[in-house]
From Swiss-Prot:
Subunit structure: The cytochrome bc1 complex contains 3 respiratory subunits (MT-CYB, CYC1 and UQCRFS1), 2 core proteins (UQCRC1 and UQCRC2) and probably 6 low-molecular weight proteins.
Annotated Pfam families: Cytochrom_B_C (PF00032), Cytochrome_B (PF00033)
Cofactor(s), by name: heme b
Miscellaneous comment text of the record: Heme 1 (or BL or b562) is low-potential and absorbs at about 562 nm, and heme 2 (or BH or b566) is high-potential and absorbs at about 566 nm.
Gene Ontology BP term (one): mitochondrial electron transport, ubiquinol to cytochrome c
Biological source species: Rana amurensis (Siberian wood frog)
Topology relative to the membrane: Multi-pass membrane protein
Subcellular location: Mitochondrion inner membrane
Keyword Metal-binding recorded: yes
The name this protein goes by in its record: Cytochrome b
Family: Belongs to the cytochrome b family.
Residues annotated for a ubiquinone binding in this entry: 202
Length: 380
């Protein structure tokens, strides 16, 4: 019998053991679809971004006009731009669901895979931030000014660091050029880190909803889960196409349709919706350095998850008390997202401070203590 080429060819062998003959737990739910959806988002963003970069001009006097030119004069340019802008929102929706699934089902106990995933989240946030500056609208300019200015809170080197990033004494042409460079290169770095993420995942195999060892009950990835992923692709691409054609500016900011003007400050400076929860945490601390540290820690706290997991059970499926607080964390993050989009006035300031405190309280105190409590109650 002739040996199957995909099992022996050096290149095909890697693809085969990653996407075809990969042993996969038979009971993984649709929650496990988000990893492949993130891969699709990355491919879509690189593809649309590459075509947009062909027509974009990274110059303060031409950037805004070049976006208008893409939308008006380039064949299907409006569609490329809308797919790219809304594709970023879908990217974040998928990554937040992916992280939520990891927290719910205890996937963070695969330490290397989890830690690389958190690094990917940082890279994605950086890419989205520098990308938001490129259209050079009012919110682009003032968002860049406010967020980069936060680095001045760093002791001793702060002001020098900000000027180094700006390439001058204010956000100007040099800033836009380097932000475009970063926005172009970061997706390729994300692709490389994603491959490392997959490499570590395939060392251990996927977890499953029960949190139990699934070695006794595995099936090949293809055709069972490849078709399941394909259904996810169809649903997500359909939703993205619908949003990009019927309501392309639904998630954007109207201020960004006004060219950047350093002399006029918008009434309310805010980032895109997917970074609002971090922005709310930033604003809830009255001290500048404290706010910056709180934002960084709000993501870095995810690195602690494998360390603070004290329960003998992996998944929240069999942990009713911890499950309640998991959903409280989700609700709390939704409240922070809402607060980040509101003006800085009461009662929003107070709500933001309470929600920020609860966010860290759930992670640092409640997760480890609930694990110990449930062990005691279950006598395990």
């Amino acid at each position: 019998m002739t040996p199957t080429m995909r099992k022996f060819h050096p290149l095909l062998k890697f693809i085969n053991y990653s996407f075809i003959d990969l042993p996969t737990p038979s009971n993984i739910s649709a929650s496990w679809n988000f990893g492949s959806l993130l891969g699709l988002c990355l491919i879509a963003q690189i593809a649309t971004g590459l075509f947009l970069a062909m027509h974009y001009t990274a110059d303060t006097s031409l950037a805004f006009s070049s976006i208008a030119h893409i939308c008006r004069d380039v064949n299907n340019g409006w569609l490329l731009r809308n797919l790219h802008a809304n594709g970023a929102s879908f990217f974040f929706i998928c990554i937040y669901f992916h992280i939520g699934r990891g927290l719910y089902y205890g996937s963070y106990l695969y330490k290397e895979t989890w830690n690389i995933g958190v690094i990917l989240l940082f890279l994605l946030m950086a890419t989205a931030f520098v990308g938001y500056v490129l259209p050079w609208g009012q919110m682009s300019f003032w968002g860049a000014t406010v967020i980069t200015n936060l680095l001045s809170a760093a002791p001793y080197i702060g002001s020098n660091l900000v000027q180094w990033i700006w390439g001058g004494f204010s956000v100007d042409n040099a800033t836009l050029t380097r932000f475009f460079t970063f926005h172009f290169i970061l997706p390729f770095i994300i692709t490389a880190v994603s491959l490392i993420h997959l490499l570590f995942l395939h060392q251990t195999g996927s977890s499953n909803p029960t949190g139990l060892n699934s070695n006794l009950d595995k099936v090949s990835f293809h055709p069972y889960f490849s078709y399941k992923d394909l259904l996810g692709f169809v649903i997500m691409l359909g939703a993205l196409a619908s949003l990009s054609t019927f309501a392309p500016n639904l998630l954007g900011d109207p201020d960004n349709f006004t060219p950047a003007n350093p002399l006029v400050t918008p009434p309310h400076i805010k980032p895109e919706w997917y970074l609002l929860f971090a922005y709310a945490i930033l604003r809830s601390i009255p001290n500048k350095l404290g706010g910056v540290l709180a934002v960084v820690l709000s993501i870095m706290v995810l690195f602690l998850m494998p360390i603070i997991h004290t329960s003998k059970l992996r998944s929240l499926m069999f942990r009713p008390i911890a499950k309640t607080f998991f959903w409280a964390l989700i609700a709390n993050t939704a409240i922070l997202t809402w607060i980040g989009g509101q003006p800085v006035e009461d009662p929003f300031i107070t709500i933001g401070q309470i929600a920020s405190g609860l966010y860290f309280l759930i992670f640092v105190l409640l997760i480890p203590s609930l694990g110990l409590l449930e062990n005691k109650l279950l006598k395990i």
